[in-house]
Structures are given as structure tokens and as C-alpha cells.
Amino acid sequence: MSRLIVGLIAVAVVIGAGAGSGAGAEPPTASQSAATKPPIHKMLIPYPQKRKREMAAYSTRHYGQYKWRLNDPKLIVIHYAEAGSISSIFNTFRTDQPDVEFHELPNVCSHYAVSASGGVNKFVPPTIRCRHTVGLNWTAIGIEHVGFSDQDILNRPAQLNGSLQFVQWLRCRFGIPVSQVIGHNESLSSPFYKELDPRFQGQTHGDWNHADMQTYRSDLTKLGDC
């Protein structure tokens, strides 16, 4: 009888040690975090055949490919939208009109956007090309963030965590290494950069500079391998 009691106490101690919470709790393993698909809210912009033809024509001018499909993406480009809400980003991408910067069709877009609270919104399937980064639209998935600077996102824990968890799942889905998760400002140094139009060669944006992306990639690496 006494041996049974001692055995039950030992089992209870082991279970109690494994069920701790708070500061003593173990974080999820890398494999668990990498495999978790976060909730994704669909807010699909109109992308009819006309816009697809325009995207194929754009790809011909800039990449020498008459294609609108995004096959086997090789990298993920991180942006901030200079916008204060998801609806503002959606409305910028929704209408198919010449973009304000280069006056080309189709209009610009990114595939996803992360809200200030960390929620993920899907604008375009990652099997369709979007105009978000000159020289890389032929092979890159674009992710916008609500905010007006890199630091806006890096200093909002909920948004940063939501972004990291989503990008971890997305890169694992497509077999994209952490080194190929880049900021828009890093586009010109990408080995995948390709631009045939001389007017666009050397063009990039200031969002997500190298130093801030090093911080982002370091945090992403902490989530582990796929």
C-alpha cells in the first residue's frame, strides 16, 4: 500500500513539472511553431482577366516573360504601407488604374497585409503576380504592414509577432530560407533581381532597410527550421 502511494506521488510530481505555466513554462518547439498556419482573413481585390493580361504585358516589358502566374516564388519582400489601416491598403490596391509613381498598368498590389494588431489579410493569392517590388515581382511574394516606418512595426509586439508567425508559416510552405525574406530596400542586392527597362533599373524604396531587416530575420530565425 505504501509503495502505491509513493508511486502515485512520483507520477503527480512529474505531471506537475510538465504542466507548468508562466515564466517556468517551456515555449513551443520550432517544429510546432513552423507548422502552424495562422488565421488568414480574405479581402481579395478584383483581379479579372483584364488585370491578368496587363500583368503579363508588364512582365514582358520588365522580365521578358509573358506571364501573370507566380510559380515557385523564391523570396518574400517585407513592406510598410504608409497607411494607418488595412482598409486603406485594400482601397489603394483595389482599383485597376495606372499607379501614381510610374503610371503603368496594372495597379500596384501586395499579396498580404498585417494589421497593427497582428492579423493577417489576404489580397491576392500567392499564385498570381503582384506589382510591389521593381525587379522582383516575377518571383516574390509581397507582405504589407500597417504603419509608417520599420520602427512602427518593430515596436508593436502584437503586430511583429503576428508578422513573424505568418512569415514563418509562409516561407516553410514554399521552401523559402530566412535569408530570402528581405526588405523592399534590399531589393537591388537580391540575386533574383531582374529589370529590363532602363528607366526602372536601380529603383527601390526606403522601407525596411538592411539593419531593421537584420533584426526581423534574427527574430524569425528564433522560430526554428521548417
What function would you assign to each model-found segment?
Residues 12-18:
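Hydrophobic h-region of N-terminal signal peptides that target proteins for export
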Residues 28-52, 70, 149-226:
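Basic/polar, cationic surfaces and motifs that engage anionic cell-wall
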Residues 63-65, 109-110, 147-158:
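Second-shell loop/turn segments in exported
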Residues 81-83, 144-148:
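Short glycine-rich beta-strand segments
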Residues 134-145:
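Short coil-to-beta-strand
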Residues 2-9, 20-133:
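N-terminal catalytic cores of peptidoglycan-degrading enzymes
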